[in-house]
Amino acid sequence: MLETERDNIRKHFLKYTRQAFQGLPKMESPHILDVGCGSGIPTIELAKLSGGQVTGIDVDQSQLSILNERIVEEGLSRRVFVRNCSLFDIDFPDETFDVIWAEGSLHIVGFEKGLKEWRHLLKSGGFLVAHDGIKDVSSKLDRVPVLGYKLVTHFALPEDTWQTKYFEPLEQLIQKWRNKAKTPETLSLLESYQNEVNMYKMNPKENVSAFYIFQKT
């Protein structure tokens, strides 16, 4: 299945998910919100790392359906939950979560908007972990205290990570499937993947990213 093979490429980034998680203090059975979870590559990993409860939210029901299948396969039905929910209107009670995890979703919502609007969802002293670009990072981090957080730590991914671990393998995957793709759905996926690659090639230096750990103050 094409989407499964693409997700296998995305698993190259789990080493950085694990590294970021190790930057958090030890918590017993934390409640984690995975914002923009997609098909749940980090979601499942977070459940295994934390031993706690993970709620994944996204608006793409097809991706959530894949995640639901993975939850059953991994035997995590009592600890991992999904909800079809907009990233711009997250409807949970105040102070529900110990950790908010955002791998790529701040890029969609906006750095300042995400930190500001998601803050009330965190318990006192809770953490927001974000995988985001490093463009304008100094000005972004200057705003963090004003938004009600402090920076705990951050680390950048190696500069060639996106090229060697994602876009080059993705391009190889596209070539592999191009001649055997038959269904409109598969052809549409291939087109979307190719668009990703094309956008990357237009400005590869934009695809340098880092993990940030913020604590609610």
Model-predicted segments: where are they?
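Class I SAM-dependent methyltransferase Rossmann-like catalytic core
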Residues: M1-H12
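Conserved alpha-helix/loop element of class I SAM-dependent methyltransferases that forms part
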Residues: R10-E28
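Class I SAM-dependent methyltransferase SAM/SAH-binding core
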Residues: L33, S39-D89
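A short acidic, Gly/Pro-enriched loop at the edge of an enzyme's catalytic core
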Residues: F88-V99
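A short SAM/SAH-binding and catalytic strip from SAM-dependent methyltransferases
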Residues: V99-E112
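A short glycine-rich, Lys/Arg-flanked "PGG" loop and its adjoining helix->strand segment in the class I
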Residues: E112-F127
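Conserved Class I S-adenosyl-L-methionine
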Residues: P158-T217
